[in-house]
Amino acid sequence: MADAATQLPWEAVIGLETHVQLGTDSKIFTAASTTFGDEPNTHIDPVVCGLPGTLPVLNQKVLEYAVKAAMALNLNIAEHSKFDRKQYFYPDLPKNYQISQFDQPIAEEGWIEVEVAEKGKDTYLKTIGIERLHMEEDAGKLVHAGSDRLAGSTHSLVDYNRAGVALAEIVSKPDLRTGREAAEYASEIRRIMRYLGVSDGNMQEGSLRCDVNISVRRGPDAPFGTKVEIKNMNSFSAIQKAVDYEIKRQVKAYETGEPVVQETRLWDEGKQLTKSMRSKEGASDYRYFPDPDLGPIEVSPEQREGWRAELPELPAAKRHRYADDLGLSQYDARVLTDERQMADYFEAVVTAGADAKLSANWITGDLAAYVNSNRLSFAALPFRPEQLSEMVQLIDGGKISGKIAKEILPELLEKGGSPKAIVDERGLGMISDPAAIEAIVDELLGAHPEEVEAFRGGKTKLQGFFVGQLMKKTGGKADPKLANQILSQKLKGG
């Protein structure tokens, strides 16, 4: 008889290490520029290269950004922390050690709330613990000639422009269980960093990079299995696919008696699988010791209070407020808060007096489509929030129809302007005079006697035909509610 433990379903145990490039103008320990995309090796200096006689000095803006990020992740800020040297030899590391934080990070023990939308399942909220956030310097970048990878290349070059750029490494607790949860967690981290303005989170440019640690076990009470690290995922979709693949690979290995070894694997986007890269190092392999060139880091109570006061309302808080106070659906709240500029635009529209639900529909629909297709931002949109608010209030007040609004919208999106002024100038306002609509209805009924007779004979669906004719004759300007009311009365012989 099979052991009871083998009857339990497999469970994945997943944690993420998220490396966030902090958006400072200069590097973490030197004044060298952090500009992305310039000629190789144009943003290096003696400090970056670790030349004899140079001393690093902590960029105070890096400390501010790291503390703000930690606060947004509900982490406890350390009164005292320090930098350490992490020893390893690799061509993209000019000093042969990396300045990082080991046993005294800047912040520990936090959490974030993640909204998980699984396809075909109900959306659910999950709290993910965060173990720590620490500051460190980035490494350079290897460029392989003749191939995107080392394999197949003729030679490799190293670009140190990225070396010394400030990073905040955010280490989650192993609270994630699926590829979707991992992707949603990473997405929420980026969303928070963007709201704070401490990073652009551009994964294609390496501003946000994730390493995933995965193991599987039989049931939630079983000990953790052998942990495998996955690298080389440059999108949230890649994170989800890599995790899902690795879970299946490990489960299959255990079920067929193959060993699962502690190693680092790379996600191959083309082949949609993970491949072994190297054995995974432990902390002892790096021979950490306190950096003798950098003093202890202290964050004063005044600094904490000042930086906390500058924090914006964060995405999760906005989502709850939009749903609870404004009556928006979970979906609308999620879409509107995805980018801070969209959320700010929406709030300005509602503050100017427009209905929240109607405003959300226009912003997440027509406006978002225009912004995305034209590669604009909501902040740069000529159609200002108060102008959209005016248009929404015209619709909500029965002054114009949705059809008319869509007709004038392209011009407004391109040039901005007052919707009311355009409506008044072109005579596009809704016809809401009962006598005027009644006269048009009488004319229509007189022009279609056979349809009138058929309606009175029981084919009541013909009312839709008359509504269509009425709207066609009025250019969509007749008040729909009033038009239906008068049509119904007249068709019944009233």
Swiss-Prot record:
InterPro entries: Asn/Gln-tRNA_amidoTrfase_suB/E (IPR017959), Asn/Gln-tRNA_Trfase_suB/E_cat (IPR006075), Asn/Gln_amidotransferase (IPR018027), Asn/Gln_tRNA_amidoTrase-B-like (IPR003789), GatB (IPR004413), GatB_C_1 (IPR042114), GatB_Yqey_C_2 (IPR023168), Gln-tRNA_amidoTrfase_suB_CS (IPR017958). One of its GO terms (molecular function) is asparaginyl-tRNA synthase (glutamine-hydrolyzing) activity. Pfam families: GatB_N, GatB_Yqey. The keyword Phosphoprotein does not apply. Keywords: ATP-binding, Ligase, Nucleotide-binding, Protein biosynthesis. Signal peptide: none annotated. GO terms for biological process: glutaminyl-tRNAGln biosynthesis via transamidation; translation. Its EC number is 6.3.5.-. It catalyses: L-glutamyl-tRNA(Gln) + L-glutamine + ATP + H2O = L-glutaminyl-tRNA(Gln) + L-glutamate + ADP + phosphate + H(+); L-aspartyl-tRNA(Asn) + L-glutamine + ATP + H2O = L-asparaginyl-tRNA(Asn) + L-glutamate + ADP + phosphate + 2 H(+). HAMAP family: GatB. Belongs to the GatB/GatE family. GatB subfamily. Allows the formation of correctly charged Asn-tRNA(Asn) or Gln-tRNA(Gln) through the transamidation of misacylated Asp-tRNA(Asn) or Glu-tRNA(Gln) in organisms which lack either or both of asparaginyl-tRNA or glutaminyl-tRNA synthetases. The reaction takes place in the presence of glutamine and ATP through an activated phospho-Asp-tRNA(Asn) or phospho-Glu-tRNA(Gln). Heterotrimer of A, B and C subunits. This is Aspartyl/glutamyl-tRNA(Asn/Gln) amidotransferase subunit B. It comes from Synechococcus sp. (strain CC9902). The gene is gatB.
